[in-house]
Amino acid sequence: MLEKMKDIVKGNDLCVLATVSEGKPHCSLMSYISDEEGQEVYLISHKETKKYSNLMENPTVSLLIDTREEEKGKRRIYIKALTVSGEFQTIKDPGKKDIIRAKFLKRHPHLTNFLNDPGAEIFSIRIKSFQLLDGVKDAFFETID
């Protein structure tokens, strides 16, 4: 089941990022890419946003990734919803950041101007656990070491 969960992460590129500040949740629709193992997700944000401020205050996050696009035109009971719990991390290594940036541009060419903005920051979410709702009633939970 863990591999199925990782495949959902690797096979998609849009998620909802949930952050928290002072007990108040904040959700953002985000483009993303993942590493090849499905254990880390990379996103981009301006540093002067509510979400980035929340991340700096509280690095614990949740992502929602689903298969509604894959299931378009089918019955909604087949949609899979994956809740990902993880931890925000800055990327300090310039070489790694350049590699991620190139991969991000390849997957999301429509974000070229955003990625070239000096105020934009690429960051990662290190995945800690998954909760998969497969259809309307089958739920599975997995942690990553």
Language-model features, listed with the residues they occupy:
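A generic "binding-loop/recognition-motif" signal
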Residues: K47-E48, K128
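Extreme N-terminal tail/first-helix region
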Residues: M1-C15
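Alpha-helix boundary recognition
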Residues: V9-K10, M56, L105
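Short, surface-exposed beta-strand-loop junctions and turns on beta-sheet-rich folds
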Residues: T49-K50, E70, D138-F140
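Charged, gly/pro-rich active-site loop segments
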Residues: R76-D145
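Structural motif corresponding to alpha-helix initiation and N-cap regions
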Residues: L2, E48-T49
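Proline-centered flexible-loop/turn and helix-kink motifs
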Residues: E57-P59, P109
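Short beta-strand segments
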Residues: N12-K47, S53-L55, S62-T67, K74
